[in-house]
Amino acid sequence: MIDVQTKQTYSVSKTHPDGIFRIDDFNFLYNCNVYSYDTILFKYAGYDTRGFIDAQLQYYLKLNQPCNFETPSILNHYARYIADCNVLGSLVSLPKHEDIAYDLFERIYVAEKQPGLDFYQNQLLSAFYDIEKNGIQINPTKFTEAFGQSFSVNEDKSYTQYNYYTTTGRPSNRFGGINFAALNKDDGSRDCFVSRFENGSLVELDFNSYHPRLIASLTGYDFGSEDVYEHLAKHYHDTQTPTKPQILQAKESTFRQIYGGISKQYLHVPFFKAAKELAERLWYFAQDHGYIESPVSGRKLILANYQDITLYTLFNYFLQMYETEFNVLTLKPIQDQLQNHKTVAVLYTYDSILFDVPSEELDYLLKEVIPQSIDLNKFPVKIKKGITYSEMKLC
């Protein structure tokens, strides 16, 4: 521990063999501003972290980049030569721990509370922690066939770990050598993920045409009750009855325009005209003020933190930040309604959420929780259900 005013270091311990001042909670610090490098790790260790300030998150919100603090060489040394030891920290002397902590403090400490901290720490970190701790039930044999041995597995569950500190603001999800954000749909590897409940099922909530609809929510554009890409195909091809190939082409063109920049030839389409105006408003605001601000969290994307950024790169960063924060606003009420139930969210992948559901709670999830948590007129969803993650069928 470090007193940020005096820079004095202290050692408190729960299990270290040299610890004199041993603790089981941090109640003695509740009247202080407590900065922790990673509040989620403290939560996994069983500590109450209410009132803590996540220093890593503060750093990220200020600089829009992660703190790349390398694991100290002494811990790497022990990890290499005593690979099966799960108490490596106890092998390092307390004075050395203090040195490591002070080095980290010097690199990461940001005193001023950053815009967006309350939302990111109290809602975003909490929402993804609640998913991580549930794990995904696996068939051990099929899991090993698909992924080999992985330290992500414990008691027939594979655990995930979200990394929030990305350039775009979209959490990545790679843990134990597995990229859970991009599991292959075609090679059978998803077949190892199953329900933890007897006669249970995996249920996937998948947002339709998510980014166009997010842009529509920001601009006031109304797709009505139409499929987004059918709606846009009518404008692309000047027809009220677009063909399936025309709708598919509209989908491909829409992705290119949103992520690569909107071409003049598409500005006759009202949706793209509105999207371009939004991108330009954000860009001009950033040029004048040096940042743009999230309408959800108040987080600032600071222009000086990005080298050679363009109008549409900034627009994409803004859109992915908004997507993530909007998803948290969706996740939290769902998780709140499931608190006293067996159903759990087990995986989040940008525009979809995977649930593990016992048979007796399926109707509750589909007919009560989801409709009460999502405006299905503005954000329609597809619901798929399966015994394994590779056998999902539309409900």
Language model: regions and residue ranges:
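Acidic, low-complexity, intrinsically disordered interaction modules
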Residues: 114-117
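Long, charged/polar-rich coiled-coil alpha-helical scaffolds that serve as structural arms
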Residues: 119, 126, 138-142
